[in-house]
C-alpha cells in the first residue's frame, strides 16, 4: 500500500493578498515529479466538498498537487492573475516539473486563459467548465439577477453558500474573454473535458462543444446522471482524471 504523505498548508503573496494553499506531496520522492494545480469554481473553495481532497490523494501517487483559494474576488481577471501567481510559485519550487492545470467550473475558465498564455503548461482539465459565461450566469443567477447587473445595479446573494455582493463589473469583466476562440486555438497539448450528463448550471452541450472545438490530443468524459457539482459522482470523476493523468504523465 502506498503511504500518503502529510499535506502541507502554506501561502504565497498574491496581487490581492495572501493566497492560501494546500500541497499534497507526491508519494514518489523525486522533486521533479509533475505538478497538478487545481482551481476552484464560482463561490467555491479548495476543499470542494471533500472531492478535491480525494482527487489530490489519488493524483499524489504520480504528482504533487496544489490546491488554493482565490482571495474572495469573483472577477475572472483577478482570478486569472492569482492563478498565474500560483503557477509562478510552482515553477520556482518545482523547477523543471511538468505542470497541469485543472479548473472546476469558473476555475476552468481561469485555467483555460492562463494555460493559453503559458506554453509551459503541459495539460489542461476542464471540469464542468462553461465556454459561454454570459449564458451560464443568466442561467445560474436568474434573469432578474442577471439584468440587475446588466443595468448597472449591484446584486446581493444570500444563500447556503453565504453572502456575496456582485457588482456590474462582474459582467463587464467576463465579456473580455472569448473562451470559444481560446478553445479553437488549443492544440498539441493534452486536454480533458469532464462533464456531468445532468449538469443543471452548465449544460452538457457546452462541455461537448469545448471538446469538439479543441485540437488533439483530447478526451471527453461524460459522467451519467452527474450534476454540476458531481454531488454523488465525485469519486468517479476524480478517478477519470487520475486515469487521464497517468496516460499523459507516465
What kind of region is each of these model predictions?
Residues 18, 28-60, 65-70:
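Short, surface-exposed "cap/lid" segments of acyl-processing enzymes
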Residues 101-103, 127:
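Short beta-strand immediately N-terminal to the catalytic nucleophile in serine-hydrolase-like folds
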Residues 42, 69-73, 130, 226:
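Short beta-to-alpha linker loops that shape the active-site pocket of alpha/beta-hydrolase fold enzymes
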Residues 59, 114-115:
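Aromatic pocket-lining residues of Rossmann-like dinucleotide-binding sites
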Residues 67-98:
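Catalytic nucleophile-loop/oxyanion-hole region of alpha/beta-hydrolase
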Residues 103-107, 111:
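Gly/Ala-rich beta-loop-alpha elbow adjacent to hydrolase catalytic centers
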Residues 9, 19, 118-222, 226-250:
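The alpha/beta-hydrolase serine catalytic core
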Residues 1-28:
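N-terminal cap/lid segment of alpha/beta-hydrolase-fold proteins
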